[in-house]
């Protein structure tokens, strides 16, 4: 019998859909409390996953889903930096 390899699934905090882990962006809160975009998926800290869609990120920000997932209040400056990093990652 052939074993099939499991593909890790994660839920997008914006649209609440389960998707492959590699198809999502990871936003991480480091142990020091710094919030950043994790392009490698290997940074240390608590992570939340979002689709590669600006609408999902905007919805996660607007409804404070990202704050709940990361268990930390997030300032507008950090949100703007995340959106800026997202835009640079798309190019």
Language model regions located:
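C-terminal structural segments of small proteins and small subunits
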Residues: 58, 62-91
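N-terminal, polar/charged subdomain of small-to-medium soluble alpha/beta proteins
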Residues: 7-9, 17, 32-36, 90
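Cys/His-coordinated zinc-binding microdomains
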Residues: 16, 52-57
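Short recognition patches in nucleic-acid-associated and regulatory proteins
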Residues: 20-38
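Short, flexible, mixed-charge glycine/proline-rich loop motifs
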Residues: 1-8, 40-44
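Residues immediately within or flanking Cys/His clusters that coordinate Zn2+
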Residues: 9-12, 48
